[in-house]
């Protein structure tokens, strides 16, 4: 698989590249960015999706831990509400690629951050076909439990995580039904016609909120959320919550949750 060099101008990419070259250039086979950052479709909702391909001897190293901590500062500056860290595999895993962890289809739309070259060739061998149904049912069970427990997001951090789970369902559904991975953005059009309007409504509302995303953080919240310490960030989210705007709350009405239930029921019948 050939992966082309990232040629955008996002500051987060430049900072990670500089950090890698200055201090950590010996521990990686490659650093890859995927998702909206790679395709130059960044909007305020966008988070940072990056894959580290680590040389095997550094997988448990202090160098790798320091890199993650230092690079997360730049990533959290890009998206203070980022709810996941780096994806990572070892160089040896390329010969038995974990397709269920990060589908190969995602990498086809990715870009290389390091090393610096017009493109690199990465040989990926998938020896074990993943059980795509497992990932799908794991996700819809999480969502179903939220509905059954009458859980609702209390702040923007929780809302983003919740919406991201919902918007991953079309991708997981496609993979489970067709036994192959797909780029998340392409999955919406690929499966939309399978569902009735009332079943698909929850996806449309989640997408609308995504497109209107504009969290209002005060200076203290922003400064606190730049910190990569997970426990500290949890405390910030709990004790200095970022309020959900009324325009978003109005969309998260009974119709939204009823549609989510209908979507889940439809999928359980289909798969």
What are these regions (language model features)?
Residues 1-10, 185, 189-197, 201-202, ...:
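N-terminal regions immediately upstream of nucleotidyltransferase
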Residues 26, 43-45, 160:
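A generic fold-level signal
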């Amino acid at each position: 698989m050939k992966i082309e060099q990232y040629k955008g101008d996002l500051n987060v990419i430049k900072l990670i590249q500089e950090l890698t070259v200055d201090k950590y250039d010996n521990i990686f086979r490659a650093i890859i960015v995927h998702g909206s950052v790679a395709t130059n479709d960044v909007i305020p909702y966008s988070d940072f999706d990056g894959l580290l391909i680590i040389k095997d001897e550094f997988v448990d190293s202090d160098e790798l831990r320091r890199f993650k901590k230092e690079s997360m500062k730049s990533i959290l500056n890009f998206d203070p509400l980022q709810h996941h860290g780096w994806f990572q595999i070892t160089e040896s895993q390329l010969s038995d690629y974990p397709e269920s962890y990060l589908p190969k289809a995602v990498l086809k739309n990715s870009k290389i951050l390091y090393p610096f070259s017009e493109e690199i060739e990465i040989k990926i061998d998938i020896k074990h076909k993943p059980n795509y149904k497992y990932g799908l049912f794991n996700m819809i069970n999480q969502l179903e439990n939220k509905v059954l427990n009458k859980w609702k997001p209390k702040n923007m951090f929780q809302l983003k995580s919740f919406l991201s789970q919902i918007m991953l369902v079309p991708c997981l559904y496609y993979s489970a039904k067709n036994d192959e991975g797909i780029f998340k953005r392409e999955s919406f059009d690929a499966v939309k016609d399978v569902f009735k309007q009332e079943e698909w409504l929850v996806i449309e509302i989640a997408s609308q909120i995504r497109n209107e995303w504009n969290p209002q953080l005060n200076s203290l919240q922003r400064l606190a959320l730049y910190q990569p310490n997970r426990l500290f960030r949890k405390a910030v989210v709990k004790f200095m919550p970022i309020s959900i705007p009324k325009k978003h709350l109005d969309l998260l009405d009974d119709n939204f949750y009823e549609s989510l239930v209908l979507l889940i029921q439809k999928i359980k019948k289909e798969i």
